[in-house]
Structure formats: structure tokens, C-alpha cells
């Protein structure tokens, strides 16, 4: 049976479920999760999406992204997928949500209400090769500059939210100081 995604309205109110590929072909708005893991040096862990992924293959992206299953809370889905994709278990905090829409190169449509989580982990990930073919720790300022120079090397959703991610990290540092 095909994986299902949770269909939502613009307020993130659940309105149904649909097959994942059907939702990406039709452009149905559905719930998603994006995880950003930082180390103690405040570097962000990026993954390079596996060549076998059905969209955005071979592109650099945030640490982990996926969809919650029907009746699964976003926080639980985020912890599950972070373990499955990158072999990392850590505390995650939801930071914000945003909606983005993009027509991808293979004519699939990303139309997601994305819940963004931050976590902290020191050490190397153990990526699932079906999900990620490479990884690296990067400084956020370097990433912002590289996204400006080479946007084609990154997932659309990373570009869509990176400025808000950077602003949240700045707010977090200000609160701690």
C-alpha cells in the first residue's frame, strides 16, 4: 500500500489523507516535517539526498525531512524519521511552521505545511543510504552565501525557509546570552 500523507488546509487543520504520490502529482496541500540539527559549534548538519529519491535526488538539504503518517503527531514523526534517515536520536523543539509550493523538475508538486524542528547533536550521523548519500556540517553564513551562488544544488524547501532558520538561531543565541 502506498504511503499516505495528511491533507490540511492553510491553517494546518486536517481535512483528509491521500496517497503520497497522488498528493505530489496533484499538488494537494499536506503536512510535512523538516528537521535542522546543530552541533555545539552551531554548525548545521546537511544531508545530500540519495540518487534514488523520487524527487530532489542528489540535492543538499536540511538534516531530515518527511511526512507524518495519518494519526501521527509531528513531533513523534520527526523523532522517528531522524532516527530512520540519519541514525540520530536527540531532543527536538518545534520552532515554526510555513507553507511553500514548488513545481519540481520531474513535474511533481511540493505543496506543504511544513513544521520545522531544531535539535542538537555532536558526533557523526549514520545515514540510511536509501535516504542520504552524503552529509556535512556547515556554518549558516556559509550556507546562506552558497545558496545565493548555487541554488540549483539545494532543495527548494531549504531555500524557502533558511532565512527564518537563521533568524531563529539568532534569537536562540540572544536568549542564552
UniProtKB/Swiss-Prot annotation:
Native source species: Aromatoleum aromaticum (strain DSM 19018 / LMG 30748 / EbN1)
Name of this protein: Isopentenyl-diphosphate Delta-isomerase 1
Pathway stated in the Swiss-Prot or TrEMBL entry: Isoprenoid biosynthesis; dimethylallyl diphosphate biosynthesis; dimethylallyl diphosphate from isopentenyl diphosphate: step 1/1
CDD domains per the UniProt record, alphabetical: NUDIX_IPP_Isomerase (cd02885)
Family: Belongs to the IPP isomerase type 1 family.
Catalytic activity: isopentenyl diphosphate = dimethylallyl diphosphate
Subcellular location: Cytoplasm
GO biological process, alphabetically ordered: dimethylallyl diphosphate biosynthetic process; isopentenyl diphosphate biosynthetic process
GO CC annotations on file: cytoplasm
GO MF terms, alphabetically ordered: isopentenyl-diphosphate delta-isomerase activity; metal ion binding
Record-annotated Nudix hydrolase domain positions: 28-160
